[in-house]
């Protein structure tokens, strides 16, 4: 797995793609993790819309395919820092991979 300190994807394009709950495309894991925090689609989209470039943490390659890049952001919320990870997708413009509390590692 490779990491880099520059975003692979345009944050504003990501936010535009997820501008409403109807547009939210996420993995089951991301949806379940968000639900454990009490977040539904409306709340997830609300948090995603607050993301800023300064929240960027790293870009990393997928564990399964080193050619697929994923951007990771640590996003402040009323529940603390959230770990948000997304990638480009063939069918939809982007796919939300993770939405959970950031571990204190």
List each language-model region with its residue ranges.
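Ribonuclease/tRNase effector modules and their secretory precursors
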Residues: 1-105
């Amino acid at each position: 797995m490779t990491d880099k300190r520059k975003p692979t994807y345009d944050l504003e394009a990501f936010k535009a793609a997820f501008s409403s709950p109807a547009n939210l495309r996420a993995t089951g894991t991301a949806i379940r993790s968000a639900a454990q925090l009490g977040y539904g689609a409306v709340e997830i989209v609300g948090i995603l819309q607050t993301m800023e470039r300064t929240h960027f943490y790293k870009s990393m390659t997928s564990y399964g395919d080193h050619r697929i890049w994923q951007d990771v952001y640590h996003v402040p919320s009323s529940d603390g820092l959230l770990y948000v990870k997304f990638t480009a997708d063939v069918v939809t413009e982007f796919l939300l991979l993770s939405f959970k509390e950031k571990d204190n590692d």
